Amino acid sequence: MLKIKSTTVIAVMHNNEVAIGADGQATMGSTVVKGNVNKIRKLLDGKVLTGFAGSTADAFTLLDRFDEKLQRYFGHMKRSAIELAKDWRTDRYLRRLEAMLIAVNKEELLLISGTGDVIEPDNGIVTIGSGSLYAESAAIALKKHAPHLTAEEIVRESLTIAADICIYTNDNLTIEKIS
């Protein structure tokens, strides 16, 4: 099973725009197995964007479940994430899944953790993966000192900085936005 724990995914809400991006590197242990993986997915006809880190098969299982919850709860992202987290914590099969998700829409950024937690950041930035602290630090600085940048530009530059520092993050980026 392909595990993409060593990756970087970031979402930024800034100036009425939301962007999410990820690098394209997949590793198994200390070996790069692919350099152009797309870790960003669109749900609800692009109204919800998601990014994942962890085991690929596990992430797709969770994305499918999250999509089902979004359909069931009429696109209410936070409610859908909480219901997914409840399932994640109580379902014996789901508890063994090794993945983390970021979900964004026009109003919200959410981190859905591997322990079934749903976290809404208060600074408009959420990151996961091995390069997440580098990307988050860059995004915090850019939001503070370059407020004229768009959310997409902040995501791009933050991922580029993370790729320069983290050996498990490359600069083959996928970025999507919601305005």
From Swiss-Prot:
It catalyses: ATP-dependent cleavage of peptide bonds with broad specificity. InterPro entries: ATP-dep_Prtase_HsIV_su, Ntn_hydrolases_N, Proteasome_sua/b, Proteasome_suB-type. The active site is at T7. It is an enzyme of class 3 (hydrolase). Its EC number is 3.4.25.2. Na(+) binds at A163, C166, T169. It comes from the Bacteria. Pfam families: Proteasome. It is found in: Cytoplasm. Allosterically activated by HslU binding. GO terms for cellular component: HslUV protease complex; proteasome core complex. Belongs to the peptidase T1B family. HslV subfamily. Protease subunit of a proteasome-like degradation complex believed to be a general protein degrading machinery. This is ATP-dependent protease subunit HslV. It comes from Amoebophilus asiaticus (strain 5a2).
